[in-house]
Amino acid sequence: MKKSILISVLLLSLTMLFSCTQNAHIEEAPEYGDNTVSFDELKAPVTCGEIVSEIVTKFSVNTEDFDTFDYSVEESRLDEGTISYFYSGQDFTVSPDFSHVTDYCLLVPVTTAATEIGIFKLDDASAAEEMKGYFANRAAARASTFAPYNEAESEKARDALISSEGSYVWYIMTDTNSDIESTILEMIK
């Protein structure tokens, strides 16, 4: 009888030891979800036109007050002359290089207002600083245009928000620059 109890205790001990060893290996194994891609990573990159559409909707922008230049709509693309006019600066000595631009959408006022939004996507994020220089030229030109007769609009242009994130770069001349930028950042991240 003592022998059978001893054998039972020994078997029980070995079973418990073996079971603990198996659990230790399971806990050390990598989890299957470690190499998965999240839904956000699978979604297609947002277009500049989609970003501007969201801004127009969210901030109730009256699009009748603006010309829209959208890369995805061939009839509304910027031509070389318009690019030079918009971004070369007040003295037109700069020849803007938009060769890294793969997408854009702009709202440019048709009224006497400085309000303007431009969002660009680049194939090389290192070109963002150069693009920001062109946007600064645009803001300075708009500020000087309005300075003699509309100080509020001139100030709006002087306070332009010019920024970038990843391959997107933008400028915003509105009364709600930071709110619009938050919308842009929400959409591109």
Language model: regions and residue ranges:
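Repetitive helical segments and hydrophobic/amphipathic motifs
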Residues: 11-12
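C-terminal motif of bacterial Sec signal peptides marking the signal peptidase cleavage site
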Residues: 15-19
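Positively charged n-region of N-terminal signal peptides that target proteins for export
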Residues: 1-6
